[in-house]
């Protein structure tokens, strides 16, 4: 390992040379209180920035071991340090001048959710901290401007590192509150199922968001207040006793007029699979971690999926036990989404009437009289919802504003009235007695077949170069194949999408062998990530700074939408 003075001398020697001379700076340098690694140097000033990392020994960083003695605390601590590093790094970005991306400093910009990221990691055995980020090495045209890089690495960066990665220099009370919040959130999450619940929304939560393009809380809105009949309490280690609405296992229907907050509540529950930062308003909105949003998805591909639980006897004779299509309809796509969610071991379905295929959700009595059951290939969801819970243990939360048929199978009915939830179960059930229940199938359907096995990606191995590109939060591409994730609505961050792309690529190249089923592949992949970290997905000499942990549910959703599976 070289000293920082070696780097300083090297920069002096390459000043004003051709830009490729920067390649000689790769390596690790001792800056006294931390180590700076130049992991990858960009090819020219207009290319993607250089990859750098900071490494601080645990004894120097000084964070209490009690702040990282569990996985969820490690994630909370690293998330907080990433936010601090981002704040300080943003202030010094582009202070050094030059052409192209000269002077740029960048690191992951965290959103409202607390996610495990490659941007910052901590070694639980010794407290060593690593932060991975990017920097644009300065140039005049395509000539090395080493004086400006010296300014970046020796003049600007050290203060940034000192003020954000050392316990003695940060706001310790704020960090303590972050760790305490993570403990409180974990306490609710681990006790949710044993209390017979699939979700919890604390009294006083702020559910509406600032706008359709912002996840920040809306100001001056009606705060959430649980109806008495659904109010439960948790004794938390730091917050103390907290009360709120506990949604029980089973079938829950959320109804109400338009604009009264039904979908806002469901959206909060969707993202309740993640922890949220203090001040978000959804800190104590906690959902079953396996919950899946189910919706129609016209045009998606489906590969060898058993949708016979919902669709049978197609007029073209197509096999629905192993169904394939490149252009699914609303009903077939939603049927596939349900079965694929079952395959991921999801215990909770979240469904909004607004984004569902009507013919998949319901067939009323008049339609059943006109079009006989044997003439209709679709078995609607309402006829399977009770079976899903009683036979498979899968609860459902459904938002409905126009169809009252779900009053019949629902165990719990909540009305959103001017953003306030009310328990109307008894009244709704009484009213439903005057309306006939749709007839149910006489026989239970066989279990869906989850033995889909796919071969290794030989078509990829033949490629001279494999390129994975993230297309925002909603898609990624592997070479020319785009995986559309617009309707996988529980992806919270673009860096999760990037991780999904690399996860699919790794699974296709290294795990799929024609023998392991898709769920086994996903389990093996998630176990590898848990053991080795997200960076294990990469065939790279350095750790990419832009990956965030996805759930198994989204990993399998990405696999299922890959048209070359």
Language model features by range: what are they?
Residues 416-497:
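Conserved P-loop NTPase
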Residues 341-385, 389, 402-408, 412-429:
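Conserved P-loop NTPase nucleotide-binding/switch module
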Residues 1-187, 191-196, 207:
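N-terminal accessory targeting/assembly segments
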Residues 242-274:
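Glycine-rich phosphate-binding P-loop
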Residues 208-243, 278, 286-291, 295-302, ...:
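N-terminal pre-Walker A segment at the start of P-loop NTPase domains
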Residues 300, 310-331, 363-378:
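Flexible beta-alpha connector loops of hexameric P-loop NTPases
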Residues 483-565:
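Terminal-proximal interaction/regulatory segments of ATP-powered molecular machines
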Residues 193-199, 203, 259, 266-297, ...:
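Carboxylate/His-rich catalytic cores and anion/metal-binding grooves
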